């Protein structure tokens, strides 16, 4: 079998020039077409065998048709290659170099208009392959098939208004003739022979050349008049900077002009040139000239950078470029500097405008102040003129008050800023002294209160309303009260008798809301208290007919804790007076009873235990219990002090001096054939002598229950029980009744407490305003009959002071504080009630 088919070329011819043979190895083409059943057998050409994948392939060989192997089309026209002169190698190389570069386009190269282009087909395509599937080859005989039909299409068009020979559409705007085709003269490219537009397209779509487009194209061609000597045909690119860009760059570079201290001291070694150079900052590198080294030979400087031939250097002048760049930089800096100067001037204009507005406002304000001060000066001069002794129309206190009211209403700022102290001293003080010259505070305590209240609102400094001490140099009203009003009070207090306290108390009550707090404190501490202290020292409870509480207690609302130093000598004098006292004398109770709510609970209880309880115990020890002839005077003397001494002290007296003798008499009586009815009456009679509060005490209950047990044991024994029928039942009934009464009393107490709680709850629910802590204290004070009222003109750290019985308190954020010896101590509500009792 011949293997000559392996040596055929791409067209099936046998290559006689070469004896090479095809290898039987598997190629890449075999791998790619391994699973392609319709692949065309490709005969390897000599060029493919030589160059492999770098071989140039014919387009006819590497692009098979869709119909399998395509037969040669002998009906296609013959393509001739025009003969000509073969270009030289230099020109071919130049063309190859210029293929990848941009080709300049001239204005004359563009056609004026473009017509429809005929699709150029190769000679290898058959005429049958130029149409689409299902289409026709030509549109010349469009609609000719209606000769063989009934012409339904033409009829439908005519029914819809179509007129033969005219265009389609409502207004016959459609084309009448089909699109014309124009045959190109030769086989050149599109536009090679001029415009290819038909007469019909020129009529339907006229084209008017735009002058702007023509001018733009002309400018493009004009900029390309110079040819780059290097052979590059690229269009040079120019960059333009606007003034806004320069301004923005100047604002940014302004922050970066000052180099960093660290970078400005860095040592830099430049080894890019022939010699090593040392720079001491990065900024010096930017001033380095980009010039070739002089030491290099000319041939080495002109060596090409690549494998291609070295191109000739362009026309360049480094000095001219440097000068131009320097001019550009100077111009940019000048623009930036002018922009900064302009911005500075604008800011200066705005600043001066604001300063002008401020100065205008200040000027207007100063003019108003000058005008107001002139008016104030006129009024002051008028007052000064009328204050002269020889004036026919002297100034009165009421007229002076009206002048000051005018100053306060119309010229408030000037009035507040002026020195009111000096003005009041010069004008008001003489008039005020004349007004109070004939005043007697104890006879007419309300004299001058209205006029002083008016001057308080005119002269008092608002900043000193809460001032605790005296500041006469800053407040005109305080100085007025201290220098004009206080001398009259001092004179009257020196003549006042403390036992006649009502006029003085009424006088201070009338002025407590008007005078400053520190002046009231001065009156009470320096004038009133020494007089009271001296009078207490001279008081003798045995000889004085006027009780001491009658002239001490009226001072409690005003002085309160200030009277504490007087209580100790009062208790001492009362103790001395009670040394020889007997409980049969009831005058002691009348003297001591008003002091029960004044002394503290501890001091009162200690006073009672020391001076009263021993006397009562001695009296109760002398009591003789005789069922047949009982004397009750001593018992009444003791029980009469039940409200004065505590229940525990009274129960202690009964346990020690009464119940032992009482139980002993009961046992003796039961052992001598008693009459149990009489014993029952005797038992119930003694029990009725005690109050419910004493009977509710556990110790007293135990003693009476012990008596019932003794009676039950006596009835249960055989001795004497037969002598009185029904005695056992009577004693049992009595025991049951007493126990039931005790139970009912306890239940009633619990029910009362529950009812009180329910009533308080209903009251709170019915009230629209919720109860606060102050209302709760007020409710507790009402329940325990304790006086709860605010202290007039007294505050502590801005909080209102109250009297709770004899205790001074104040409330701060739901906590009650009680005044101690040196400080205020917080306490609970129950402790407060116990202290007040």
UniProtKB/Swiss-Prot annotation:
Required for interaction with DHX15: region residues: 1-50
Membrane-spanning ranges: none
Motif stretch (Nuclear localization signal): 700-705
Biological process, per Gene Ontology: biomineral tissue development; spliceosomal complex disassembly
Basic and acidic residues: compositionally biased ranges: 1-13, 53-64, 103-116, 217-231
Protein family according to the UniProt entry: Belongs to the TFP11/STIP family.
Assembly with partners or alone: Identified in the spliceosome C complex. Found in the Intron Large (IL) complex, a post-mRNA release spliceosomal complex containing the excised intron, U2, U5 and U6 snRNPs, and splicing factors. Interacts with TUFT1. Interacts with DHX15; indicative for a recruitment of DHX15 to the IL complex. Interacts with GCFC2.
Functional summary from the UniProt entry: Involved in pre-mRNA splicing, specifically in spliceosome disassembly during late-stage splicing events. Intron turnover seems to proceed through reactions in two lariat-intron associated complexes termed Intron Large (IL) and Intron Small (IS). In cooperation with DHX15 seems to mediate the transition of the U2, U5 and U6 snRNP-containing IL complex to the snRNP-free IS complex leading to efficient debranching and turnover of excised introns. May play a role in the differentiation of ameloblasts and odontoblasts or in the forming of the enamel extracellular matrix.
Record protein name field: Tuftelin-interacting protein 11
Originating organism: Pongo abelii
Gene assigned in the entry: TFIP11
